[in-house]
Structures are given as C-alpha cells and as structure tokens.
C-alpha cells in the first residue's frame, strides 16, 4: 500500500498548525492566520473551510463596518463541541478523571478520595469505569472523543509502548498504555506528571525558551522535567530523575536507594508525614503506602 502524497501530508500539517494557532488565540482573523502561517488568503480559506465543514472551527463576523465594498471580515474560533479528550491523573495524593472539550471547558470530573493502587490492573479498570460514566453522563458524541492523556507519578524513564515503573505507586513495568486502550478503545498518551505539567506551561507560553526551564514537581515524592532549545527532556533522562536523590548532608533519613539524606524522603511530602507521625528516619514506609496517610493529613 503506497504512502500518502506530499500534498496530503502538507494539508495535514497546515490544518494542525491552524488549529494550534486558533486554540492559542481563542479567536483570530484570517489575515492574522495568513501572517502567522505564511500562506495566501486563498490557502487559508481552503484550510479553514475544511475545518469548518468538519465541525472543528466556528466562523464569526467581525464587529464594525466592513472596509470598502467587500464583505465584512470574520474571525475563527474552536467549536466547543468539535472534539473532546480525557485527562487522568495518577499520583500518591491525587487520582482523578476529567472530561474536557477542545476549548478546555471541564464537562465532568471525578476525584477518588482514597484508592488503593497496589493492584495496577484493578486500579486502571476503576479509572476506566469512571471515564465511561463521565462520557455517558455528559451526552457528548462518542465519535468526537479523540483520545486521553495520563499523567502519573514516577521518577523513572517510561518504557517503550507505555510501560511504567513507579516506586511512588508501587508499580513495576506495568503496561499502562495497552491496559487503558483496551478498556476504553481510545488512543492514550502516557507521561510522567512533571513532564505533563511542563508541557502545559510551555503551551501557555509561561516558559522562556531562550533561558531554558527545569520544572520540579514536589509532592509525596519528587519528579522533574526540563525544556531547553525547543526540546523537552523527560523524567529519567539526562539525570533528571536523579534530582530527588540529591543528598542533604545533615539528614539521616534512609532513602529506598540505600543512601541517607536524599531529597526523595527528606524534602518532600514523605518528610512531612514522617515528621507529623514521628517515624524514625531509618524506618520510613515505601511511597505506595503513604497516600492514605497523606489524604488524612490534608483533610
């Protein structure tokens, strides 16, 4: 079977670029799209017409008097009912499922007050059951549900095909991606939570690409991700996963890695729990056993 033509590929690239620009600006004129995309007015009109016909974009007449004898200009915006996605968070102290539309409006959300994730297959099925309920209760067109993203707590590099090892969750080489996709019939993207958070910061243009940025997510444990020269460096790559194992010289707290003083146990939520509960520094529980204690503490 032959590959797609270059023209087809270019149309996909241009449609994707237009959707990103419209999403970033909220509402934007065709003239601005010509300026940003470097295309002619006719080219912009063809691409926008395709996206309007598929229900992804809405066209709104600009306010004010039109210039000259031509028709009044129009702005383009995302159609709130054009597409939907699911977002799933799995950390020691936060486990939730959220359904949003393409304009970032939350249509439904469920937070698990306390969930035992010791059995990953059972836990993932619980997330999927809630996702099915949110989809049904929202009344959305299931065919417009594009996919889902999972942000989970880990300091390890994610394995190929969405396999996850997470000391914080107590998971070892779990096929998270395939389990979710089989249960929901949707494409999934699996990310370390620190990287997912950094992507959101970059998308919102809160990160200066020229300077570079390292994001450190400090919860029960500690995760990190970086953005340099237009590239994301995920948790577990180039030593980023080891930030949590930088050692405090005056700390006697024993880390799961066998060393003492690691930030993972001496500078995170685990340290707060240890202090509140009076646990000895050489007998801290593993992370996967801490979520219930943390939930009770923050109530």
Regions found by a protein language model. Give the residues of each.
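Conserved phosphate-binding catalytic cores of ATP/NTP-utilizing and phosphoryl-transfer enzymes
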Residues: 59-85, 188-213
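Glycine-rich phosphate-binding loop of actin/hexokinase-like ATP-binding domains
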Residues: 210-266
């Amino acid at each position: 079977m032959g590959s797609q033509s270059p023209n087809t590929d270019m149309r996909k690239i241009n449609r994707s670029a237009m959707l990103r620009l419209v999403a970033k600006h909220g509402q934007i004129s065709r003239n601005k799209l010509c300026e940003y995309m470097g295309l002619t007015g006719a080219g912009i009109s063809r691409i926008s017409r395709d996206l309007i016909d598929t229900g992804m974009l809405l066209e709104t007449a600009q306010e004010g008097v039109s210039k000259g004898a031509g028709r009044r200009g129009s702005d383009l915006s995302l159609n709130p009912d054009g597409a939907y996605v699911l977002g799933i968070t799995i950390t020691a102290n936060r486990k939730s499922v959220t359904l949003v539309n393409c304009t970032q409006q939350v249509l439904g959300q469920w937070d698990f007050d306390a969930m035992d994730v010791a059995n990953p297959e059972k836990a993932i099925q619980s997330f999927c059951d809630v996702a099915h309920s949110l989809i049904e209760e929202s009344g959305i067109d299931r065919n417009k549900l594009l996919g889902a993203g999972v942000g989970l707590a880990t300091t390890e590099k994610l394995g190929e095909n969405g396999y996850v090892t997470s000391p914080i969750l107590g998971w070892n080489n779990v096929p998270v991606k395939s389990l979710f996709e089989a249960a929901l019939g949707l494409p999934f993207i699996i990310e370390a939570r620190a990287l997912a958070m950094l992507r959101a910061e970059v998308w919102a243009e809160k990160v200066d690409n020229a300077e570079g940025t390292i994001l450190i997510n400090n919860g029960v444990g500690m995760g990190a991700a970086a953005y340099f020269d237009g590239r994301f460096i995920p948790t577990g790559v180039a030593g980023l996963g080891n930030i949590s194992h930088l050692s405090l010289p005056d700390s006697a707290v024993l880390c799961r890695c066998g060393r003492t003083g690691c930030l993972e146990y001496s500078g995170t939520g685990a340290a707060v729990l240890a202090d509140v509960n009076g646990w000895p520094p050489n007998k801290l529980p593993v992370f996967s056993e801490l979520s219930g204690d943390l939930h009770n503490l923050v109530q």
